[in-house]
Amino acid sequence: MSGDVVVFAASSLTDAFKELASEFQKAHPSARAVFSFGGSSQLAIQLINGARADVFASADQDQMDVVQRGRGLAGGQQVFVRNRLMVIAPRDNPAGITSLQDLAKPGIKVVSAQASVPIGYYTAQLLKSASGHADFGGDFQRRVERNVVSREDTVRQIVAKIQLGEADAAVVYVTDVTPRIADQFVRISLPEDLQVTATYPIAVGNGRNPAGGEAFVAFVESPPAQAILARWGFLPPTDGA
């Protein structure tokens, strides 16, 4: 197996997959992983409109299913990691955000994602669940959404908005605040009974290097690669893994 392996991957996988690429090349010296990172929904649209990728790694099941229905996959798909959510605020935290409830306070500037983007879907799921709890109130989701000042196309864009102080708070993946930038944020955990688990499926695409795609998917599922993903904060594909 040799040549470029084109990998379309969710933006939340950027740092982990870049590290994986180095290890993948050590295992396959004649191959090279070439990445296109972006919002899973954007990547799915590209794939069903004719873009060629040897691997597609999505941040949610729906976008993978879209590509499968559009005949953009060469084989089956499987979940390879999971993720969780948290609230972040800028380091100086001018709005005094300390909990999920604070996102509904009048005047709070919240940045979120488009509804078609996985983090947007997961955030809506979280807010809907919270609205069913007496501590939050039945109109909690509506009050938070009223505070949304910007909807981004990727979770990395959301993180950048908070990092630049352009908004007071956002819901992102736990893995998005990497060690390199951790000191620039306040991180706030979610109540465990409201926590949303994001599942990430991966599959071989209809690219020009199917052998390379199969090799990359197999590597991502291997124990060494799973250990790298865990170091970046991702959870194993199942609770028992």
Feature-to-residue mapping (PLM):
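Exported/periplasmic ABC-transporter solute-binding proteins
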Residues: 1-28, 32-37, 41, 45-49, ...
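Short beta-strand->alpha-helix junction loop in the catalytic core
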Residues: 84
